[in-house]
Curated annotation (Swiss-Prot):
This is Nucleotide-binding protein EAT1b_2037. Gene3D superfamilies: 3.30.70.860, YajQ-like, domain 2. The keyword Repeat does not apply. It comes from Exiguobacterium sp. (strain ATCC BAA-1283 / AT1b). GO terms for cellular component: cytosol. Pfam families: DUF520 (PF04461). CDD domains: YajQ_like. Keywords: Nucleotide-binding. Belongs to the YajQ family. Nucleotide-binding protein.
């Protein structure tokens, strides 16, 4: 009897890599000419990124620097949820960026339906914020991986726990 193979579809953010990207971005901001004398800063607060700058233009520049550093560190930028820009103390502007982890119910249903419609001989189960896919053939599982990569999801999907 053939053994079933399986893997999990998850969406995670490596907080250590996010912290490293923030530190590298802060160093770049300290050395950039257009940020000299500015009150621009970024920090990690309760699992959220907080971006503070003098005005909207510098805030956008701050986001651009951060995004390039996150991409270089291999952190998925699809999992960043930008909140509304708000005024802060001292005439500065602040923007919170939520770090999304886990697959929400809508995306999980979308993945599940796509797998069922593909007619591959695999089973998929939604387990909280991840999806377990099992099947006898590794080729079918790889086809499911390719299918999930092609879907338009609100978060970045990763594949873990191969068995």
């Amino acid at each position: 009897m053939a053994k079933d193979n399986s893997f999990d579809i998850v969406s995670e953010m490596n907080l250590e890599e996010v912290k490293n990207a923030i530190q590298i971005a802060e160093k770049e901001i300290l050395n950039r000419y257009d940020f000299k004398g500015s009150k621009s800063e970024m920090s990690l607060d309760n699992g959220d990124l907080v971006l503070i700058s003098d005005d909207d233009y510098k805030l956008e520049q701050l986001k651009d620097v951060l995004i390039t550093k996150l991409i270089k560190r291999g952190v998925p930028t699809k999992n960043l949820d930008y909140q509304k820009v708000e005024n802060a103390l001292g005439g500065t502007v602040r923007q919170r960026v939520k770090l999304k982890s886990g697959i929400d119910k809508d995306d999980a249903k979308k993945i599940n339906n796509a797998i069922k419609e593909s007619k591959l001989k695999v089973k998929s189960q939604i387990q909280d914020d991840q999806i377990r896919v099992t099947g006898k053939s590794r080729d079918d599982l790889q086809a499911v991986m390719q299918l999930v990569r092609e879907l338009e999801l609100s978060v970045d999907a990763q594949f873990t726990n191969f068995r």
